[in-house]
Amino acid sequence: MSCKEHKVVHEAHNVEARKTPDHFYRSQPGPSYVQDIEQYRTMYQQSIEDPDAFFGEKAREFLHWEKDFTHVRAGSLRTGDTAWFLNGELNAAYNCVDRHALENPDKVAIIYEADDEADNRVVTFGELLRQVSQVAGVLQSWGVKKGDTVAVYMPMIPEAVVAMLAVARLGAVHSVIFAGFSSGSLRDRIVDAESKVVITCDEGRRGGKTVHTKKIVDEGLAGVGVVSHILVFQRTGSEGIPMKAGRDFWWHEEVRKQRGYLPPVSVNAEDPIFLLYTSGSTGSPKGVVHTTGGYLLGAALTTRYVFDIHPEDVLFTAGDVGWITGHTYALYGPLCLGTATIIFESTPAYPDYGRYWRIIQRHKATHFYVAPTAMRLIKTVGEQEISKYDLSSLRVLGSVGEPIAPDLWEWYNEKVGNNNCVVCDTMWQTESGSHLIAPLAGAIPTKPGSATVPFFGINACIIDPVTGDELEGNDVEGVLAIKSPWPSMARSVWNNHDRYIETYLKPYPGYYFTGDGAGRDHDGYYWIRGRVDDVVNVSGHRLSTAEIEAALSEHEGVSQAAVVGIADELTGQAVVAFVSLKEGYGRGSSTDTDPESIAPDVVPLDTLRRELVLQVRAEIGPFAAPKSVIVVDDLPKTRSGKIMRRTLRKISANEADQLGDLSTLANPETVPAIIAAVGAQFLKGKK
């Protein structure tokens, strides 16, 4: 597309809205909870114009309250004191376990897909109630009470879910720490949350490899006196696990001492249910605080309406409980609705790339929710496995974690869904608690690349980042913000409410700042651009880095691409592109980290750079062409698969000494190599 032809939200003009496939309706256990877009519009309008009536009714319909609330909401975004369901009392574990166990104790709650498929098992709601009660009894015997924080550092096993619900049963606050974090990162989070109890396991198993979980905990707690008790589940049963007398206790020994039922502790709707740490741009990670009533309702509503989940369905969320996706859509959402959830311990590549599809076939999963990163991996190296399995049970394919490119959306729909499923591209974040923008399966026509429409109560808007003014109408681009509170939004940052205000509410007073850029197309559909700081302004042209990355990725040799903006005296900002190459693309080790080792049959780096620049010029326009293209072995990513563009931006700006918190990186070894590559490339450019 040339500069003259560049349109606002131009992708929307290149795709057609997709109607719901007939297979979706034929395979439903019952009618859709929202029948069509007109019903959505009616419900959405009520949720915005009369949120007290809408959410008051939904809260009483979806949740069990020990004490009814007196007021639906109070406070505002401007003052940062939002509250929902005032004076109401409830318990999250009761809502997710007890009420379903009382109705049908033999119904399956958890389907466990272990690293080794021979270890698979299921947990019924009756069994889950007993296990949660027993672990809660252990914690109670150690003095854990309402408001205390308990750290959970476990792999994706049913006992991680049991631990979280046991903490919630006591009205305490769980702080789940991803089991891939280092001992130092674990220590920082335990100390910040002041967790006196840690729940962990002896070892973990992932991708056929052993993770020394308890050893990492011991290293993290060396010299830290805040923790008084550690509960250790025997995942592998390996001998020689060090246990500190008086502090460390075996799960199986302690639960034997407890009764099979412990009454839940009712808490106020605004009492915290959990805190979850996210990476900050500088300094230490921030513990985002979610509250019981609002969060639980958001989880239940979005699971029901976005995915059109029925009690008979099986939801396979391929996300870890160490992240918000696992919290909301592997645990609280499905279990609150009494729906079976698949807990997956392994990786999509172990023991082979057919693992996801065997899981779906074996358990007749109806819903599959996964990050685009995993689908890109399978598209590249494991696509041939898909056709070997019967995936006809699927009705809904979800995408989470980052915007899904239209071509990957199409591939996902065709190869995994056989064009029979609804593809739900969901936009949300740790701080939102549940979906912000997403199609309602069966009701909203979808568009490849678009997250579509706001969920109920999400008063979404587009703000001009320069003027701060709200942009009215359609065909607009800017910053995505929310202009009224919603139940599941985070209330604060643990022990640092000022940081919460500064990060989310101060940038645009009266609005919640998502940090994402977005466009609203001619149909009112939203297209997510990624983080606002991932928008580059070159000579007055606001360019989405995702758009440039998509153009780079169309080159036959590019495996992954990431684009950042750096200051430029002439154009204001300039585009810097980082690319890694596909295996076997005539590269040997010919990256910018090792530019001299080019084999005779490879494409020279300078030639490749020119091709990539021309690719972007042809796809978008001359104004979008990268000023520098840097070839690296790999890009820095979080453990949830997101590329850390902030890190690339800092390195490109010669601020490698200001990288901030890197604890969420899955591959920290990439950073020194990228620093060297950037230095070599920029020095070369000055010669």
From Swiss-Prot:
Binding site for CoA: 206-209, 325, 539, 617
EC numbers, comma separated: 6.2.1.1
Domain of life, source organism: Eukaryota
An annotated GO cellular component: nucleolus
UniProt catalytic activity: acetate + ATP + CoA = acetyl-CoA + AMP + diphosphate
Molecular functions (GO terms): acetate-CoA ligase activity; acid-ammonia (or amide) ligase activity; AMP binding; ATP binding
Residues annotated for ATP binding in this entry: 401-403, 425-430, 516, 531, 542
Gene from which this protein is expressed: ACS2
Cystine bridges: none
Keywords for the protein's UniProt record, in alphabetical order: ATP-binding, Ligase, Nucleotide-binding
CDD domains with a match to the protein in the record: ACS
Family (UniProt): Belongs to the ATP-dependent AMP-binding enzyme family.
GO biological process, one term: acetyl-CoA biosynthetic process from acetate
NCBIfam families: Ac_CoA_lig_AcsA, PRK00174.1
Protein name in the entry: Acetyl-coenzyme A synthetase 2
